[in-house]
Amino acid sequence: PLTSVYCLYRGGITGLIGISDGTKVAARYSYLAKMFPKILDIPSDFMKGGEVNVEEVLKLKPDVVFYNAARPEEGEAYRRIGLPAVCFRTEKYHGDPLGTIADWLGYLERIFGAGEGTAGVSDYGMKTLQMVRDRIAAAGDLKRPKAVIFAGYSGNQLVASGSNHYSEFYLRECGAVNVAAEIDGQKGVNLEQVYEWDPEVILINNFCPYVPEDFYENKIAGYDWGLVSAVKNKRVYKFPLGIYRWYPPSGDTPLCILWVAQQLHPELFSDVDIAKELRDYYQKFYHYEPTDEDIAKILHPGREAAIFN
């Protein structure tokens, strides 16, 4: 997800000489590649299956390497061969994606100086969050739907996001009950657990290969969705895929807050034109004017971005 924030910060792919294989897959099926087509030419073969070949990174002659703080051994490997390396945390703010991207933007400013397109991003995000909070608070005894976010699919099981993850932030702030709160982080869940929870709303991350129709048409092996409220009432939604997958922190995180709130409380946020918000945001911060077709594809993505080559 850092790549999308980097491109937002620098106004493009300037200085970017290597990206992860997962980032390239997401870019190929998102609008990152449409905005900056040459990102698909940036090398990613130094990483296979999530494992980094440090010697191959060295051949790229980077001035600095960014890596995930959850992989300290990777940072040590870079330093052993003399490469300056900076870690970026994805969980520093206990699942708050707004705090996370603000942190990342601060790091990038310290490294590169003033950014090209970031003035106002954090403010927009905080104003959006406050609007959602105020509207939910003003609604008084608003019914909070039971909801679950499926983050992926592993070991023939859907993976649910619980506490201490972005799901906690989105569902709490946007007015829902996280039925998977008993899970610390992410964990595979079976059919019996889903029946026990009986979520009224299901949100699907872009790391998960399924789309709402797979739930409605019972196409997920090992699961029968006919008795689940969210499926019976056609309240299964796929997270949008804009400049990156919207569930984790990205340049589009401020928009994601609005989108989640609207899926959970469509009547309360019926006046929000998410397509207009998206268009205005992209024009202001990415200097890119999406077409109606672009917006439709962003808001209703397919399954391709979950496929890692």
Task: Give short role names for the model-derived ranges.
Residues P1-L60, V64, A69-A70:
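A short, structured surface patch at a secondary-structure boundary
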Residues P1-T3, G22-V25, V64-V65, A70-E74, ...:
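Solvent-exposed loop/turn segments at secondary-structure junctions
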Residues Y9-G11, L58-K59, R79-R80, A139-K143, ...:
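Extracellular/periplasmic catalytic domains that process cell-envelope and extracellular macromolecules
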Residues G18, Y67, C87-F88, A181, ...:
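Short beta-strand and adjacent tight-turn residues that come in two discontinuous sequence segments
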Residues F46, V159-Q186:
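Alpha-helical, coiled-coil/dimerization segments enriched in small aliphatic residues
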Residues V52-N53, E73-E74, V189-Q193:
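Short acidic active-site motifs
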Residues E74-N156, V177-A181, V231-P301, A305-F308:
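Extracytoplasmic substrate-binding proteins
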Residues A181, Q186-L241:
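A contiguous binding-surface segment within folded domains or other stable secondary-structure elements
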